[in-house]
């Protein structure tokens, strides 16, 4: 299963995918349902980690509807 880190912002977000094969894919994308569907909708089920923010609730629900496993965390990891 791929692991995806998603740094959400109001207009544009950063995406980092670590594939099962160890490949790292980094992208910037507009923060919208349409772009998340276009970029992540066709990918196999992945584990996605989101930083908790004002955008994270609707994004998490949308990504779960696309079939992904979504976790949200605070900005500070200890």
Where are these regions (language model features)?
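Phosphate- and other anionic-substrate recognition elements at nucleic-acid/protein interfaces
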Residues: 1-78
């Amino acid at each position: 299963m791929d692991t995806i880190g998603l740094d959400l912002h109001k207009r544009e977000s950063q995406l980092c995918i670590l594939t099962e094969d160890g490949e790292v894919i980094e992208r910037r994308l507009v923060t919208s349902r349409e772009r998340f569907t276009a970029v992540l909708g066709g990918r196999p089920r992945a584990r996605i980690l989101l930083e908790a923010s004002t955008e994270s609730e609707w994004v998490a629900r949308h990504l779960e509807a696309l079939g992904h496993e979504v976790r949200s965390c605070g900005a500070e990891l200890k």
